[in-house]
Amino acid sequence: MNQLDALKQFTTVVADTGDFKQLAQFQPQDATTNPSLILKAVQQPEYAPLLQDTVARCKGRTMDDIIDRLLVRFGCEILAIIPGRVSTEVDARLSFDTYASITRAERIIDLYQAEGIDIDRVLIKIAATWEGIKAAEKLEQRGIHTNLTLLFSFAQAVACGQARVQLISPFVGRIYDWHKKQAGAHWDEAAAAGANDPGVRSVTQIYNHYKHFGIATEVMGASFRNLGQITALAGCDLLTIAPELLARLVASAAPLQPALDAEAAKGMALPAVNYDEAGWRYALNEDAMATEKLAEGIRAFAADAVKLEQLILASG
């Protein structure tokens, strides 16, 4: 049995790509997209007709509407291939605007429903800012499920659990990147591998907290740099993995056992943690890595949204 099939026995495997033509070979349950992945996809020749057709159908519409319709087109193509859910992201430039995030999310859901898609098959991705978490809380109350992304800290995860969001995406690889850069020449790759990887440790702490306190929010590890990070999180609720790493899992026959254990977490001696807004903002501020990576991630997704707009203008 290859490692991908082994992983599927105890973790829901999710494909992290906008390139939906790669999905069938890996047979993931769910799929995730983001502005960067969609931008990458529409620049490939095989997806140019989809972009051009969407733009042609949207003459006279606002740029926001065109982008949402393009994201939903990709989402519908993905849902025709996978049995589960697709994550579609709200514009990162709305990350500090609760009301605008809610409005945009509801519009995306309306577009999916117009295509006959059951809304339970769609997760709305929103950056895990305080405003984003509050938007997700309201959306969940309205029956719209959310995926809180750009999550780098325990404080973000706690607030998402309090808000009863459907799913969170802690970014393993970007946490790893930050610590490796900070350590510089002192970084010891072997010592920081597997369960000792800082990104893996972060997801493990969040997973154990959720399971210990009976928090229903799903944990989906994301942003992987190597197979060791993936195998060290086997047993996590979900893992979203890029096609390149999915292919490497298929190519490996190394034994794989669960590394995370929900039942074991229930028996751990863990402190209860809750945040109000002031406490949460202070906790995030105290975490230099999370503060920097959250801001950097929002800027990067926003920049790619601008590039996507430029592509749309050029194709029109």
UniProtKB/Swiss-Prot annotation:
Name assigned to this protein: Transaldolase
Protein family per UniProt: Belongs to the transaldolase family. Type 1 subfamily.
Any one GO molecular-function label of the UniProt entry: transaldolase activity
Catalytic residue positions: 125
Catalytic activity: D-sedoheptulose 7-phosphate + D-glyceraldehyde 3-phosphate = D-erythrose 4-phosphate + beta-D-fructose 6-phosphate
Major site of localization recorded for this protein: cytoplasm
Alphabetically ordered keywords of this record: Cytoplasm, Pentose shunt, Schiff base, Transferase
Subunit structure: Homodimer.
Pathway(s) per entry: Carbohydrate degradation; pentose phosphate pathway; D-glyceraldehyde 3-phosphate and beta-D-fructose 6-phosphate from D-ribose 5-phosphate and D-xylulose 5-phosphate (non-oxidative stage): step 2/3
Lineage of producing organism: Bacteria, Pseudomonadati, Pseudomonadota, Betaproteobacteria, Burkholderiales
GO CC annotations, alphabetized: cytoplasm
Superkingdom assignment: Bacteria
HAMAP family assigned to the protein according to its UniProt record, in alphabetical order: Transaldolase_1 (MF_00492)
Compartments in which it is found: Cytoplasm
Keyword ATP-binding in annotation: no
Its biological purpose: Transaldolase is important for the balance of metabolites in the pentose-phosphate pathway.
Record-listed E.C. numbers: 2.2.1.2
Gene Ontology BP terms: carbohydrate metabolic process; pentose-phosphate shunt
InterPro entries per the UniProt record, alphabetical: Aldolase_TIM, TAL/FSA, Transaldolase_1, Transaldolase_AS
Enzyme class: transferase
Originating organism: Verminephrobacter eiseniae (strain EF01-2)
Pfam families in the record: TAL_FSA (PF00923)
Keyword Transferase attributed: yes
